[in-house]
């Protein structure tokens, strides 16, 4: 597995990663398209695309600062879910630096929030 940083919409991995992002998160949790495109060039914002054998398998959208890393969105292709790919990907990403990682989920009032919480607790 590799991590590819996207800094422009012209990157060939941007469109498939955005399609998975749009399919994986409710619209109220998504960044608007114009805002997403504008923030790509921010030095602390990392739009990472996880690839396996060159094929995109998920976005990991995060802020990487000198003091912490904050994950905004993380998704894995439905074909790879349930096979520990997401856990391995997050662990590999976390091992790349020694700053604390901040994860955020919504209150545990929806099925998706409960599932996300369980996933993060297993890490």
Regions picked out by a protein language model, each given a short descriptive name:
Residues 1-35:
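Short amphipathic alpha-helix that is part of the acyltransferase structural core
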Residues 22-56:
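Active-site rim helix/loop that mediates acceptor-substrate recognition in acyltransferases
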Residues 49, 54-64, 68-75:
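Conserved beta-strand in the GNAT
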Residues 74, 79, 104-108:
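Short strand-loop junctions, especially beta-strand C-caps/beta-turns
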Residues 76, 82-95:
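Conserved acetyl-CoA-binding loop-helix of GNAT-fold acetyltransferases
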Residues 96-111:
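Conserved GNAT acetyl-CoA-binding A-motif
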Residues 107-123:
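Conserved active-site alpha-helix within GNAT-family acetyltransferase domains
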């Amino acid at each position: 597995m590799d991590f590819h940083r996207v800094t422009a919409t012209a990157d060939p991995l941007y469109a498939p990663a955005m399609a998975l992002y749009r399919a994986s998160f409710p619209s109220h949790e998504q960044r608007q398209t114009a805002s997403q495109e504008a923030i790509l060039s921010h030095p602390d914002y990392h739009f990472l695309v996880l690839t396996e054998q060159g094929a995109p398998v998920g976005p990991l959208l995060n802020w990487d600062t000198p003091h912490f890393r904050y994950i905004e969105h993380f998704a894995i292709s439905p074909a790879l879910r349930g096979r520990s790919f997401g856990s391995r990907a997050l662990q590999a990403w976390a091992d790349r630096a020694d700053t604390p990682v901040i994860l955020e989920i919504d209150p545990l009032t929806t099925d998706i929030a409960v599932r996300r919480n369980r996933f993060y607790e297993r890490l």
